Amino acid sequence: MSIRGKTVLITLAITLIGTAPVWSQSLVKTLDTDNDGTVDLAEAKSAASKLFDKLDRDHDGTLDKRELRGRVNAKDFATADPDNDGTLDKNEFLALVEKRFKAADPDNDGTIDAKELKSAAGRSLAPLLK
């Protein structure tokens, strides 16, 4: 690889590393309705409930894979759909949010901060909140 190519890759990597905290801090700030610097489960579920309503374009009270637009992979969708009807109702969707929230809260303090949101578990939760 040329020196120019390496320079471009290094610059890109630095940019991505530098922006990771910004998006997670921004999301926490958006969801943190009590302004304590963290997101608790109630705040996460409130945001997820609003997103559910926004994604439910046909207003049938469920989300199918098309409406979820890649926010949930096939394996997680199947697990979150215990009645196997091919859709998630709001309770099933919020149960998935709670499961991902708990996975993103390794210290079990009931809140997620920007650092926890940047973890793999936090990154899987984020698309269900915004």
Spans of model-derived segments:
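Bacterial N-terminal signal peptides that target proteins for export
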Residues: M1-I10
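Bacterial N-terminal signal peptides
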Residues: I10-T19
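Short beta-strand elements of solenoid repeat domains
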Residues: T30, D53-K54, T79, K102-A103, ...
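Acidic carboxylate motifs that coordinate Ca2+ or other divalent cations, activating on Asp/Glu
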Residues: D32-D36, D56-D60, D81-D85, D105-D109, ...
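Carboxylate-dense, calcium-coordinating segments in secreted/extracellular and ER-lumen proteins
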Residues: T33, T38-K45, T62-R69, D89-L94, ...
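Mid-chain, structured segments of secreted extracytoplasmic proteins
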Residues: D60-A103
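Short, low-complexity, Pro/Ser/Thr/Gly-rich segments in the mature regions of secreted, periplasmic
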Residues: A120-K130
